[in-house]
Amino acid sequence: MTISVQTNASAIIALQNLNKTATDLQGAQSIISTGLLINTAKDNASVWSIAQGQRANVGALSAVQASLNRASSIADVAQTAGASISDLLNQVKQKVVAAQDPSLDTTSRAAYNTDFQSLLRQISDVVNNASFDGANILNGSLAGNISFLANADASSFITLSAQNMSLGSSIITIGSTASILTLTASATVLAEVNASIINVNSALGDMGAQATEIQNHTTFVAKLSDVLNQGIGNLVDADMAKESAQLQALQAQQQLGVQALSIANSAPQIVLQLFK
């Protein structure tokens, strides 16, 4: 081997190797700290681009899940209120049927009418308070359906139908001023009560079916989001056991490289020894 005081080829090579090891070590440390094999576009442009696209879809699905969760809450509140209304209508029917007794005196009939009016007010209170986040599908404030996001590109929607259960509506046909003070009036109201009970129970069935549809779709969206996250992980996640082993190997190489550079740098000293 030629020894020169002008050019130390061995030291240059050792330094190059040490620099490469340092670069590789920095990369390994970055992978371990982030847990990502592909963290930026420079790591692998095509894979990074695909992963970013899927991350965008996952983010959009989070918005879909939020919309569907709101739909479920609105439906749950409406169903709870609807069940209470159904129970109140059963009590209303009891009072109206009792008022059909021709033997009742005026005082007794008035007492039944007072109870009847109280129950109607309770129905109105339930209807008016069946709101979630400003949405009430029972009080007639919504003319049709409420639409909620169903997919990541906002091109598909799932709907929750308004069910107007206000007094005097097409579902509860009993008017707010209805009275059972007379036999004739109570007979008219009884027909309205019977129709209202049927209508409310039918509306509750529709709401239940829609709530189930919303819940099923919410479950699907959550699973889809999980699958996409797993797919992203398959693309960019690092094998931590492998990377840990690689880090240890690079650390050993770095130590050896430092020693090699030290040895190479000491070679020119041999020239000085020749002149002693």
List where the protein language model places each region.
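Primary detection of the long, small/polar-rich alpha-helical "axial" segments characteristic
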Residues: 1-276
